């Protein structure tokens, strides 16, 4: 019963953060329409979210166990509830910068706490993996739900007014429900004797880990992956609206296919890995991603979907582009798994901190770079740009494979 109550608290929290974190693409589109700003200006919202996650993860990772996971989660949820209530009453672009900064800082707290609590309440690897996959599965449900929640408040026109901001009252209510579920969850604080003797030492160990060649090439690979994912995911609603000329609500709903493709891709990859090696799967996925970009983007020229009324009427090319998420899906979890497995157990917490930080930096870079190219050239040019990090990933993943083999050989000899 206690495990169920804890799982509900963690799942509710991850669900609402999935909606908020992945709303940045929708908010960018609406900010362009509602506040008459450029795509380059709007793209900074991704930076406010991801850089907040990166900086705050560095700042609080070793401090959270000392104040308690439950207290930390309640603070994060309380802060997000308050900012969601503030947004509709101000209705200015700068408040969205504050919104995503608060969301980013709060998610840094939440992710560290949730992963730590899962380790507390499970006593073997299989149970840990099962609970973690359940929570991450709920996260993907939240991502999918978010597109439809926002589109229902926006309507079928371009809606340059501010009435769509009322969605944040609903979101504040959902975050409030998560707050209550965590409040009544029997989440325990870690034992004092298990905490590191020095927060500064833990921080220095994390920095020292980044100097290892294997870790460095992994960081580059993770950075490139998130650059692609956030560049595509964040700007897909705007691409649908301004390149394919689809209505705003349909543009946002159609972007949910990308999230669905990511979820399905990870489930399928889990089964395929029973039969093929991780390296072969990743190389195949990268080649398929590049092929899909080269095949689909030429089909998006001269499309006028302004008369489309629902997602069932959109042009074929509009369905195809989000499917890049299916091939993209296995990359990130597989890279993380291989990297963590190559390290000693006592180094994995520090490695997790580095993953969070450089993933956030990659997301910011991808969104800003895509927005800049989109603004100066076109949406097609911006999405063709993904071919560059895809090619770089082919090289970095190959090098990563070779280095993990070298590490395995050394461990066997020792």
What does each model-found stretch correspond to?
Residues 93, 134-187:
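Helix-loop-helix hairpin linking two adjacent transmembrane segments in secondary transporters
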Residues 56-68, 265-278, 303-304, 374-375:
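Helix-to-loop junctions at the C-terminal end of transmembrane segments
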Residues 78-91, 288-310:
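C-terminal ends and interior cores of transmembrane alpha-helices
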Residues 55-94:
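Conserved MFS/SLC helix-loop-helix module at the cytosolic interface between two early adjacent transmembrane helices
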Residues 109-123, 329-344:
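Intracellular juxtamembrane helix-capping segments at the cytosolic ends
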Residues 99-137:
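Cytoplasmic helix-loop-helix junction between adjacent transmembrane helices
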Residues 36, 68, 89-94, 245, ...:
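Helix-breaking motifs and short loop linkers at transmembrane-helix boundaries and internal kinks
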Residues 24-25, 211-256:
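Extracytoplasmic gate region of multi-pass secondary transporters
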């Amino acid at each position: 019963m206690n495990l169920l109550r804890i799982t509900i608290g963690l799942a509710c929290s991850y669900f609402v953060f999935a909606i908020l974190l992945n709303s940045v693409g929708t908010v960018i589109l609406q900010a362009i329409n509602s506040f008459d700003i450029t795509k380059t200006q709007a793209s900074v919202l991704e930076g406010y979210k991801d850089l907040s996650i990166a900086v705050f993860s560095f700042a609080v990772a070793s401090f959270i166990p000392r104040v308690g996971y439950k207290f930390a989660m309640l603070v994060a949820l309380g802060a997000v509830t308050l900012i969601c209530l503030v947004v509709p009453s101000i209705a200015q672009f700068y408040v969205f910068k504050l919104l995503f900064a608060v969301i980013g800082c709060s998610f840094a707290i939440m992710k560290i706490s949730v992963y730590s609590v899962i380790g507390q309440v499970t006593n073997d690897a299989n149970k840990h993996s099962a609970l973690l996959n359940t929570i991450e599965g709920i996260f993907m449900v939240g991502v999918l739900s978010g597109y439809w929640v926002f589109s229902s408040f926006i309507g079928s026109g371009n809606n340059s007014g501010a009435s769509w901001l009322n969605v944040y009252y609903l979101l504040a209510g959902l975050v409030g429900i998560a707050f209550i579920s965590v409040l009544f969850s029997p989440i325990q604080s870690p034992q004092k004797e298990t905490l590191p003797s020095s927060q500064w030492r833990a921080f220095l160990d994390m920095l020292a880990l980044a100097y290892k060649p294997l870790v460095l090439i992994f960081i580059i690979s993770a950075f490139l992956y998130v650059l692609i994912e956030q560049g595509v995911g964040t700007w897909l609603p705007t691409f649908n609206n301004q390149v394919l000329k689809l209505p705003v609500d349909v543009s946002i709903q159609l972007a949910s296919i990308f999230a669905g493709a990511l979820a399905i891709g990870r489930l399928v990859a889990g089964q395929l890995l029973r039969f093929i090696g991780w390296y072969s799967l990743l190389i195949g996925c990268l080649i398929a991603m590049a092929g899909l970009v080269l095949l689909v983007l030429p089909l998006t020229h001269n499309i006028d979907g302004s008369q489309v009324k629902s997602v069932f009427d959109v042009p074929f090319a509009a369905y195809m582009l989000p499917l890049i998420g299916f091939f993209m899906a296995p990359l990130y979890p597989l890279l993380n798994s291989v990297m963590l497995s190559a390290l000693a157990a006592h180094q994995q917490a520090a490695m997790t901190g580095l993953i969070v930080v450089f993933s956030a930096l990659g997301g910011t870079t991808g969104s800003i770079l895509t927005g800049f190219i989109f603004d100066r050239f076109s949406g097609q040019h911006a999405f063709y740009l993904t071919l560059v990090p895809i090619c770089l990933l082919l090289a970095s993943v190959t090098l990563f494979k070779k280095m993990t083999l070298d590490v395995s050989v050394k461990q066997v000899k020792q």
